[in-house]
UniProtKB/Swiss-Prot annotation, chain A:
Keyword set, alphabetical order: Acetylation, Cytoplasm, Disease variant, Exosome, Isopeptide bond, Neurodegeneration, Nucleus, RNA-binding, rRNA processing, Ubl conjugation
Cellular component, GO, one term: nucleus
SUPFAM superfamilies: Eukaryotic type KH-domain (KH-domain type I), Nucleic acid-binding proteins, Ribosomal L27 protein-like
Protein name: Exosome complex component RRP40
Residues annotated as transmembrane: none
GO molecular function, one term: RNA binding
Native source species: Homo sapiens
Family under the similarity heading: Belongs to the RRP40 family.
InterPro entries: Exosome_RNA_bind1/RRP40/RRP4, KH_dom_type_1, KH_dom_type_1_sf, NA-bd_OB-fold, RRP40_KH-I, RRP40_N, Rrp40_S1
Modified residues (N-acetylalanine): A2
């Protein structure tokens, strides 16, 4: 007689916590603990080494390290919560220990304050528009948050329009709020996105790659056809070219370039430039 | 076009004798896993153990009905569909077990008033189904980018009871302990496999 019994085992936090510096650029899994540089010296080989007490307290240089997406602080270590590659950025002005984050590939967007996103207006209720940004709840957009909008001069926004704006309130406890003006009151490219064009969805990792400062893909695409393009950090791209065929070609290229190597991409671009 | 990572792992250790309870050496069947194969869900994974295969999809953090929302953490739902027929009581009990495991591991407090839904579909069943469901759910949650404080896996083990030893409770307990120890040792193989398959996926970018 045999009785099956299932055992669900939770992964222990690895054999030993590793130093964050040694894992840079490698794939980390949820549940791993990472040591910050200042703790590495304390944890010598053998753990339970007694350190002699020093009478004059050495100036313990507390370096302020920022925990980015995918990492959480647990005790005095960093706990990895998402799977991806560990990255580090040195501090610019010299204060603090820099930023650590996990570069993960995701499809679902979670609103973050300050992000510029493309939203679709789904409802108009009184003075507020409800905008779908791809998160767990629709964001709210007041009609006064457009450039030059007053109570008498309302902006021309209909249900179904595309809006490019940024979040002013976005945390886990409150409904996200977005606006289409910057802190000086100018539109700065935000607002209702014009007619025609095509909106499509890609992964968040691809958007970050395309918006990196020196991205070759955008420069090459720009040389191909004259186009207008808007990137939303929520994974949405709006593109418009002179003809529908060119627009579709551009949309297909941008969707596919996530999985292509740079050689394949150059081949495709050269083939398109010829035709 | 979908990003697929096919990872196969064959883990074989020494096999114990037939009738006695399993020793520390264990033999797990051939594994295979594929991630990001479905276009609609935020995360998806297909896990194969020998001939048992389960497909998992994760949606979240997404909108939740006001009746089901929890004010300070995410609402986790698990739906398990058998290969044929309608879901019954056995599926409900398995769903509850998988949900309890996921709730212990997913950081729900980061996404209050949202819902995270895990949908599991049994594609073929040739033993150790619950373990395969747990593994598929874990890989799908990782693929969706849901924040977790640890990974989890499932390993199934069976108790063989001999006629004379059934009556003696202490040796029965011993057998259970041996099973637990063997399963824990085997779970290290599964975690190593997770790491290898995810590294292969990220090595392309």
């Amino acid at each position: 007689m045999a009785e099956p019994a299932s055992v669900a085992a939770e992964s222990l936090a690895g054999s030993r916590a590793r130093a964050a510096r040694t894992v840079l650029g490698q794939v980390v899994l949820p549940g791993e603990e990472l040591l910050l540089p200042e703790q590495e010296d304390a944890e010598g080989p053998g753990g339970a080494v007694e350190r002699p007490l020093s009478l004059n307290a050495r100036a313990c240089s507390r370096v302020r390290v920022v925990c980015g997406p995918g990492l959480r602080r647990c005790g005095d270590r960093l706990l990895v919560t998402k799977c991806g590659r560990l990255r580090h950025k040195e501090p610019g002005s010299g204060s603090g220990g820099g930023v650590y984050w996990v570069d993960s590939q995701q499809k679902r967007y979670v609103p973050v304050k300050g992000d510029h996103v493309i939203g679709i207006v789904t409802a108009k209720s009184g003075d507020i528009f409800k905008v779908d940004v791809g998160g767990s709840e629709p964001a709210s957009l007041s009609y006064l948050s457009f450039e030059g909008a007053t109570k008498r001069n309302r902006p021309n926004v209909q249900v179904g329009d595309l809006i490019y704006g940024q979040f002013v309130v976005a945390n886990k406890d409150m409904e996200p709020e977005m606006v289409c003006i910057d802190s000086c009151g100018r539109a700065n490219g935000m607002g209702v996105i014009g007619q025609d064009g095509l909106l499509f969805k890609v992964t968040l990792g691809l958007i970050r790659k395309l918006l990196a400062p020196d991205c070759e893909i955008i420069q090459e695409v720009g040389k191909l056809y004259p186009l207008e393009i808007v990137f939303g950090m929520n994974g949405r791209i709006w593109v418009k070219a002179k003809t529908i065929q060119q627009t579709l070609i551009l949309a297909n290229i941008l969707e596919a370039c996530e999985h292509m190597t740079s050689d394949q991409r150059k081949q495709i671009f050269s083939r398109l430039a010829e035709s | 076009m979908e990003e697929e990572t096919h990872t196969d792992a064959k883990i074989r250790a020494e096999n114990g004798t037939g009738s006695s309870p399993r020793g520390p050496g264990c033999s797990l069947r051939h594994f295979a896993c594929e991630q990001n194969l479905l276009s609609r869900p935020d995360g998806s994974a297909s896990f194969l153990q020998g001939d048992t295969s389960v497909l998992a999809g994760v949606y979240g953090p997404a909108e939740v009905k006001v009746s089901k929302e929890i004010f300070n953490k995410a609402t986790l739902e698990v739906i398990l569909r058998p290969k044929i027929g309608l879901p019954g009581v056995a599926e409900k009990s398995r769903e509850r077990l998988i949900r309890n495991t996921c709730e212990a591991v997913v950081l729900g407090t980061l996404h209050p008033r949202t819902s995270i839904t895990v949908v599991l579909q049994v594609v073929s069943d040739a033993g150790s189904l619950l373990a395969c469901c747990l593994n598929a759910a874990c890989m799908a949650l990782v693929d969706a980018g849901v924040p977790m404080r640890a990974l989890f896996c499932g390993v199934a083990c069976a108790l063989d009871s001999d006629g004379t030893l059934v009556l003696d409770p202490t040796s029965k307990q011993e057998k259970l302990q041996q099973c637990l120890a063997a399963a824990q040792a085997a779970s290290q193989h599964v975690f190593r496999f997770y790491r290898e398959s995810l590294q292969r996926r990220y090595s392309k970018s």
